[in-house]
Regions:
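A structured beta-alpha segment of the ubiquitous adenosine-cofactor-binding alpha/beta core
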Residues: 116-134
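Predominantly a Rossmann-like dinucleotide-binding segment in NAD(P)-dependent oxidoreductases
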Residues: 185-187, 192-305, 455
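Bacterial N-terminal signal peptides
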Residues: 8-16
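Beta-strand-loop-alpha-helix segment that lines the small-molecule cofactor/substrate pocket
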Residues: 135, 141-142, 146-194, 208
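C-terminal helical cap and adjacent loop that interface with cofactors, partners, or active-site loops
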Residues: 24-39, 43-47, 53, 75-76, ...
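Sec/Tat signal peptide C-region and signal peptidase I cleavage site
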Residues: 18-22
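N-terminal Rossmann-like dinucleotide-binding module
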Residues: 24-110
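Positively charged n-region of N-terminal signal peptides that target proteins for export
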Residues: 1-4
Length: 548
């Protein structure tokens, strides 16, 4: 039987002294000019490594997860995992101990046992060494995404990383090599791939509703004026107290946050599942808003703000498709991810309102009979036809997780992303996004910077799959056989029910609170009482679920 409940508090660890620093231009990137194009070279795959296209890992009946980074995005992830059956939250880690401890509240409310707490600049290092963790979920500031993920993979953990998961090509290649070497999943946590509209549009694309999709658009357009002051100020690396996100935009050029717009359209275009990005050109405006913000915060002139207020990146694929991605977090305008698909037989757009354009014959061919006679692709579908089309092509992911997802907030896409990841781990299936997706979606920062720093020159993409981008024909989500899925789900529900019963039976939270409040004289006694209760609870859970 696996260890079920960890000995919280015994691992209350703190570390210091390490400062991560990421830049969108990595010194190890090799490139050369070829007829006016910057050709970024693809490193040779190290001997003995194999690609991880369609990687499957051994089934994990109970997914033991640790969270690193509990500032803005991390607490929500902890809360969501409390509602996924068959999960054990083993550890919580943040630079600031209080933030990690605060997330215990989600576990307490859900009736789950306390997790171990880690803190400090390198608290994650000891966390990653633990043998009783299957998945490390990284939601730190951008500078720490890579070092935490690297440490987790080096210690044999599946790894899920908030976006952007890698800040430059050097980090992309190192994560690729580690995933290939360890045969562990390294997933980019791109939640916008699980937006309800994007999921259904993907279903339609795969069914040919839009014909062949030739052009796509995506973006992250979100004025962050209301948020800049809330980003963490690293005491070791932010003397001007700009906050990590503004500081990164000041110091780096290129689309530094491309994945929300790029991820969903890349799936629709089957990137590295039959097609690949080949060429990129990027342009940006001058910096106005960001520069003015820094000057207001520091009281000094800012003459070196690298990131333009608005960045536009154009990409072409091997199959002749074109993608446009935009980034603007500076200027006042409504939130917009664009998400537009232009096909040979139809068109889809999410903003400013969700809509689809098909003519009468294509709508009929797609399985929906029009209720009006003059239907034309010159206008969008009427409400009834649109609703019927969305219902017919509703994603199985939405059918399974959509209702609970909406209750969990942020439109439901975060919960569906996490639930799908756990589902795939429990069923031994390939994850929805792999390490090559991570690299392809995150590389726009460095490649775009190369383009713009060289008079907006064309830049040739490296092949992150190193020759395997055409092995799989078409993007698809993996599903277990119905009987296998049902058995795994039943076991997960039974496990979580047994955990909750025994947390209450053995008064684990009362004993945890006693341990927290104990003075030096009574600390050892309180620790012993808590540890004994944990052992008894583990034994009872094992008997109830018959885990081996």
């Amino acid at each position: 039987m696996k260890k079920v409940i960890s000995l919280a508090f015994a691992a209350l660890l703190s570390f210091g002294g390490f400062t991560a620093q990421a830049q969108s231009l990595s010194p190890s990137t090799k490139w050369h000019w070829d007829k006016g194009t910057i050709v970024v070279e693809t490193p040779t795959r190290p001997a003995g490594q194999q690609d991880v296209i369609g990687l499957k890992a051994e089934k994990i009946q109970t997914v033991r997860v640790a969270f690193v980074g509990l500032g803005m995005r991390g607490p929500g992830a902890v809360n969501r995992f409390c509602h996924i059956p068959g999960v054990q939250i083993v550890a919580l880690c943040d630079y600031e101990e209080a933030r990690a401890e605060a997330c215990q509240g989600y576990l307490r409310k859900a009736g789950l046992p306390p997790a171990d707490i880690y803190s400090g600049e390198e608290g994650y290092v000891e966390l990653c060494k633990r043998p009783d963790i299957d998945l490390v979920y990284v939601a730190t500031d951008w500078d720490h995404h890579f070092p935490v993920a690297k440490c987790a993979l080096q210690n044999g953990k599946h790894t899920a990383i908030e976006v952007p998961s890698a800040m430059n090509l050097e980090q992309c290649w190192e994560l690729i090599n580690l995933s290939e070497q360890t045969r562990k999943h390294c997933m980019i946590l791109e939640n916008c791939c699980y937006d309800y509209y994007e999921l259904n549009a993907l279903q339609m694309t795969q069914a040919g509703v839009f014909g062949e999709v030739l052009r796509a658009e995506g973006a992250y357009i979100h004025n962050l004026d209301d948020f800049w002051d809330y980003y963490w100020k690293n005491p070791n690396d932010d003397p001007e107290k700009l906050g990590w996100r503004m500081k990164y935009n000041r110091d780096n050029r290129g689309d530094v946050y491309a994945t929300h717009g790029l991820g969903p359209v890349a799936q629709c275009l089957n990137i590295h599942r039959g097609d690949r990005f080949t060429t990129l050109v990027a342009m940006d405006t001058k910096s106005v808003h960001g520069r003015e913000y820094v000057e207001r915060k520091t009281g000094k002139p800012c003459t070196d703000f690298r990131n333009g207020d608005h960045t536009t990146t154009l990409m072409r694929t091997a199959d002749g498709k074109v993608v446009e991605i935009q980034h603007n977090v500076m200027n006042p305008q409504p939130y917009n991810r664009l998400f537009k698909l232009t096909g040979t037989k139809g068109y889809a757009t999410k903003y400013p309102s969700e809509a689809i354009a098909l003519d009468k014959s294509q709508l009929s061919a797609s399985g929906v009979q029009p209720q009006v006679d003059n239907l034309s692709s010159h206008g969008f579908l009427p409400e009834a036809e649109y609703a019927a089309l969305m219902k017919k092509y509703e994603s199985p992911i939405i059918k399974k997780y959509g209702e609970l997802g909406r209750e969990m907030g942020h439109g439901g896409m975060d919960f569906m992303m996490d639930a799908r990841m756990v589902y795939c781990l429990q069923n031994g299936l390939p994850l929805d996004m792999d390490v090559y997706d991570l690299a392809e979606w995150c590389c726009l920062a460095e490649l775009g910077s190369l383009s713009m720093d060289n008079n907006c020159a064309a830049v040739a993409f490296p092949d992150f799959t190193r020759g395997h981008w055409n092995d799989v024909k078409g993007y698809k989500h993996a599903y277990a056989a119905p009987e296998d899925e049902a058995a795994v789900e039943a076991a997960a529900i039974a496990y979580t029910a047994a955990v909750k019963d025994n947390v209450q039976k053995f008064n684990l939270w009362t004993l945890y609170d006693n341990l927290k409040k104990a003075d030096a004289k009574n600390k050892a006694k309180a620790q012993k009482a808590y540890n004994n209760a944990v052992k008894k609870a583990n034994t009872a859970i094992g008997k109830a679920t018959a885990q081996k």
